[in-house]
């Protein structure tokens, strides 16, 4: 039973046992030298927490809201392509887990089953995430389906002008299902702010811009009236030698100036990671690799268990920090620190065999 997992690293170990080498590398790897992916972890490891004491923390509320919807904890489920390679139900398992636990899932335009089937799998709010793989008529047809299916918000990914060089996959000579019939690359490569405006107007839903990595682009995004800035480097799978997402957060929060909500993904494996992001100005975070590992370990039940374990870590850390609500966190609760171990995609765990599964 999924409840038998007592720590998230047990889910990682089970996922490795269940996945082929090809699928494991697709889920776990990054681009080229995987420097960006490592920096996602390094950014969190470079921050220490500053607890306050003698505070009544007998009652703690770890919940928040996102676009008007209640989240049990400030953790959402990031869009992942080809989920069907991780668990037979694919995106349906994620939708059901999100509803069961009490969070929001992002549905990738390159996963299975269809966006309609995933939408029908649960009644909880969902966000549709789009890669532009066709002309504006194609985009319009997708948006019409999204609206009809009842999605609550629309997310446009903009850090994939070119597909990153993911060398684990290349050397495996394997492609995920979504890449086996390659999309026409000119559409993603030719996206501009004007294209984004047209898609935003067409969508007519709360609009999330995913892949923002600098203050400069955050400032432009709020001028274009996006509702949410989603800080992401695609889990370190696109541009190598980029920054970790938590390192981007302070400048983007400042540039947005409260005119858009800020969320981020990238390297989040622990409740303390979540709280560091909230303290520095994020409204919520999203998990990608951890979500995938949990699904591969035990499907829907595994993902619910991962969220339960994160919730326990978050509540424990809040109590030890001396806060009872997330809005009590601020930059005063974090400070620079030296990491104590080399950073990689599993360096937040202490009992992974050999320290890292490959």
Language-model features and meaning:
Residues 276-304, 336, 340, 353-358:
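A compact, surface-exposed functional segment
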Residues 40, 171, 241-254, 295-315:
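C-terminal helical cap(s) of enzyme catalytic domains, especially alpha/beta-barrels
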């Amino acid at each position: 039973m999924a409840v038998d997992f007592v720590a998230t690293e047990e889910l990682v170990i089970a996922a490795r046992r269940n996945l082929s080498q090809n699928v494991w590398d697709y889920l776990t790897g990054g681009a080229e030298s995987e420097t960006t992916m490592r920096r996602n972890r390094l950014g969190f490891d470079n921050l220490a927490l500053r607890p306050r004491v003698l505070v009544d923390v007998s009652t703690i509320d770890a919940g928040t809201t996102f676009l008007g919807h209640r989240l049990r904890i400030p953790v959402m489920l990031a869009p992942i392509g080809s989920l069907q390679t991780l668990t037979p139900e694919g995106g349906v398992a994620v939708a059901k887990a999100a509803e069961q636990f009490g969070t929001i899932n992002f549905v990738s335009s390159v996963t299975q089953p269809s966006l309609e089937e995933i939408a029908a799998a649960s009644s909880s709010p969902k966000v549709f995430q789009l890669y532009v793989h066709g002309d504006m008529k194609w985009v319009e047809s997708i948006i019409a389906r999204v609206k009809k299916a009842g999605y609550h918000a629309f997310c446009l990914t903009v850090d994939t002008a070119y597909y990153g060089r993911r060398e684990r996959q290349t050397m495996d000579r394997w492609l995920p299902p979504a890449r086996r019939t390659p999309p026409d690359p000119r559409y993603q490569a030719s996206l501009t702010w004007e294209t984004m405006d047209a898609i935003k107007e067409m969508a007519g839903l709360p609009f999330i811009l995913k892949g923002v990595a600098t203050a400069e682009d955050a400032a432009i995004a709020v001028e274009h009236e996006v509702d949410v800035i989603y800080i992401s480097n695609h889990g370190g799978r696109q541009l190598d030698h980029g920054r970790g997402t938590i390192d981007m957060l302070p400048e983007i929060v400042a540039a947005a100036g409260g005119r858009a909500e800020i969320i981020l993904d990238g390297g989040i494996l622990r409740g303390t990671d979540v709280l560091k992001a909230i303290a520095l100005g994020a409204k919520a975070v999203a998990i990608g690799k951890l979500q995938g590992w949990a699904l591969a370990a035990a499907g829907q039940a595994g993902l619910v268990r991962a969220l339960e374990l994160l919730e326990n870590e978050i509540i424990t850390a809040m109590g030890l920090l001396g806060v009872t609500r997330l809005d009590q966190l601020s930059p005063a609760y974090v400070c620079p620190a030296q990491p104590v171990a080399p950073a990689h995609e599993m360096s937040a765990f202490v009992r992974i065999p050999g320290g890292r599964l490959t």
